[in-house]
């Protein structure tokens, strides 16, 4: 069973790209709160956050690509309605 993602057992779950976009927004919010802090520690945290944002953006793009691929090949997901997975096993 998945904890966060939509699945047969978790029809109220969310799509991976939606979770990642929300997480990216949270990181951006944190960045704005430390953007004026010029202490070395804050600058390093900001630099780290920028790298994290790059990785999150890449992960979002990959997840969206997978969703589009599955939509084209098998039609829209029915997992939110308790339907079977489009690929793999339940």
Q: Where does each model-flagged region fall?
A:
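N-terminal acidic leader/helix
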Residues: 1-34
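Short intrinsically disordered terminal tails
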Residues: 1-4, 76-90
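Short, charge-rich amphipathic interface segments used for partner binding and complex assembly
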Residues: 32-79
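Residue-level marker of intrinsically disordered, low-complexity segments enriched
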Residues: 3-4, 17, 32, 50, ...
């Amino acid at each position: 069973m998945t904890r966060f993602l939509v699945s047969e057992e978790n029809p109220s779950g969310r799509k991976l790209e939606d979770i990642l976009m929300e997480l990216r927004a949270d990181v951006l919010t944190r960045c704005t709160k430390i953007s004026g802090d010029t202490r070395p520690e804050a600058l390093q945290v900001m630099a780290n956050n920028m790298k994290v944002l790059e990785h999150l953006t890449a992960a979002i793009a990959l997840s969206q690509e997978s969703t589009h691929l599955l939509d084209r090949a098998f039609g829209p997901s029915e997992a939110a309605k308790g339907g079977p997975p489009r690929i793999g096993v339940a």
